[in-house]
Amino acid sequence: MGKLKGMVPFLTEDEIQELVGGLARTIEREYEGRDLVLICPLKGSVLFCADLMRKINLPLIVDFVQLTSPKGESVRILKDLTINIFQKDVVIVEEIIDAGRTLSFLRDRILASHPASLKIVALLDKPARRELPIQPDYVGRTIDDRYLIGYGLDSEEIGRNYRDIYNFAQ
């Protein structure tokens, strides 16, 4: 697969799957016997959500949202939830938490629908970039401030399909 110039390996596919498996086992233990709903923000979280839900050995429902938050503008909904999450146990599935603006908006919107519980799982957490006080409940790995590409993470829509995650020197 052609790589973009300036890409340095950060996490291999095997390392990613090990993180995903650990997160899935933790979620599975916590939600055993409960109605679980995974919310997958498009586009970046699709690969992580697909891998995570296949590793969670529980009945679950998945729904998708798409939000946009251009720099300096407010968050807008491009695709909203299609299922009722009232009194359901909801987990937002994020591939990476950066500034937290979009995730904070989504969390508040979901809480307004009165789920039984709401938690956040993040494959990668980048607290150094946080603009809002939002914390994931489950984290695959906490990272420093770096620009990553692959496994759903993109550079102008390129690289989401890479199996590994790369540090991208802009």
Regions found by a protein language model. Give the residues of each.
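PRPP-associated nucleotide enzymes
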Residues: 1-170
